[in-house]
Amino acid sequence: MKCSLRLFEKAGRLSVRSQTVQTFQQRIVLANGASYLVNTTLPKPYILSIKDITNMPLNNPKVNALSSIRGQESRRSKFEERYEGL
């Protein structure tokens, strides 16, 4: 917990205002099971990351989700062949 004092002037007199920021350690768990700690102001102890670099199909080409992208490439090539001369 960090605590700092800040002086500010209000109606011609100085006052002391305390500004308190509480930080918590948070564990972020990636899709592949790896985790790391981050200091944050969110009081949640952990976050399960749904989308990260370990489960995105473009970053991890071994994932089966790329089959739909390959299917779109073949559809696009058929479309380009059909309307090539226009």
UniProtKB/Swiss-Prot annotation:
Protein name, per record: Large ribosomal subunit protein bL31m
Family, similarity comment: Belongs to the bacterial ribosomal protein bL31 family. Highly divergent.
Induction note: Differentially expressed during meiosis.
Subunit structure and binding partners: Component of the mitochondrial large ribosomal subunit (mt-LSU). Mature yeast 74S mitochondrial ribosomes consist of a small (37S) and a large (54S) subunit. The 37S small subunit contains a 15S ribosomal RNA (15S mt-rRNA) and at least 32 different proteins. The 54S large subunit contains a 21S rRNA (21S mt-rRNA) and at least 45 different proteins.
Keywords: Mitochondrion, Ribonucleoprotein, Ribosomal protein, Transit peptide
KW Transmembrane (keyword) present: no
Species whose genome carries this gene: Schizosaccharomyces pombe (strain 972 / ATCC 24843)
Any one GO molecular function term: structural constituent of ribosome
Record carries keyword Transport: no
Location(s) in or outside the cell: Mitochondrion
GO BP term, example: mitochondrial translation
Any one of the GO CC terms: mitochondrial large ribosomal subunit
Stated role: Component of the mitochondrial ribosome (mitoribosome), a dedicated translation machinery responsible for the synthesis of mitochondrial genome-encoded proteins, including at least some of the essential transmembrane subunits of the mitochondrial respiratory chain. The mitoribosomes are attached to the mitochondrial inner membrane and translation products are cotranslationally integrated into the membrane.
InterPro entries, A to Z: Ribosomal_bL31m
Transit peptide: 1-18
